[in-house]
Amino acid sequence: MNKFKEDITKMARAKQSMDGNTAAAHVAYAYTEVAGIYPITPSSPMADSVDQWSAAGQKNIFGSKVKVVEMESEAGAAGTVHGSLATGALTTTFTASQGLLLMIPNMYKIAGEMLPSVFHVSARTVSTHALNIFGDHSDVYACRQTGFAMLAETNPQEVMDLSPVAHLAALEGKVPFINFFDGFRTSHEIQKIEKWDYEDLKEMCPMDAVEAFRKHALNPEHPTARGSHENGDVFFQHREACNKAYDALPAVVEKYMNKVNEKLGTDYGLRSEERRVGKECRSRWS
């Protein structure tokens, strides 16, 4: 998927050896103002990196440090994300497996309120009769009904290249994203990859969408009611109204993939020109 177009000049980027978790954290830090975290294998290094960078005074693309809030559990971290988004702060979290399942109640609220969050997930087996820390997609598949869009990557370079698409499409499309990749096989695989410069990430950011999101935040100067009770005469109509955003989302995702392609000379996209396509959702072994 990340082949290079011959007719596009590739932008020069710094190279660095890192794993998929670090690549996701690098992009997430750029677009995040608040991170609600709780550690769980194999996603913990993402939250740890963001916490370390914040403590060191690193700035995001908005010129501020990320405020990191560690809670008592993943359920608390998801509640932090929901509350922070409601007050107009771009908020992210990092999790996997049972940790992601604990976030599902808040995910319904975040998606239902059309709040632009990104959950970075290093996908891991959901524990059943026994604990298992290795990779499958049972955790992210359990979230399909929540209303979150899903974007997947297969290696650390794709994590670096495509994570911005999740953040930017969430902002413009008003649909939250799960950005996921295989636990351990991608999250902990160290490769020499090309990394984004924050100035390039800032250039792609739709500041008008950021401003619209902040204006929609809870504010005592212009109070609004949220989370109210609705009867059946209006609940269904209001719930269906968000379908327009989901119908428009593929075009928004493709728009930002094209922006990435313009900068990198890559050929990321949602559709293939081939007439017969086999699809897999896993890390690459070659």
Task: List where the protein language model places each region.
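Generic recognition of stable, solvent-exposed alpha-helical segments in well-folded globular domains
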Residues: 45, 158-161, 251, 255
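Conformationally flexible catalytic loops at phosphate/diphosphate-handling active centers
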Residues: 62, 66, 177-270
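Thiamine diphosphate
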Residues: 2-142, 147, 164, 183-184
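Conserved thiamine diphosphate
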Residues: 133-183, 195, 207
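Structured core elements
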Residues: 36, 178-180, 282
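Hydrophobic alpha-helical scaffolding
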Residues: 14, 18, 36, 71, ...
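Generic recognition of flexible, low-complexity loop/linker segments
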Residues: 23-25, 267-272
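Conserved small/polar residues in nucleotide/adenosyl-binding loops
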Residues: 273-281, 285
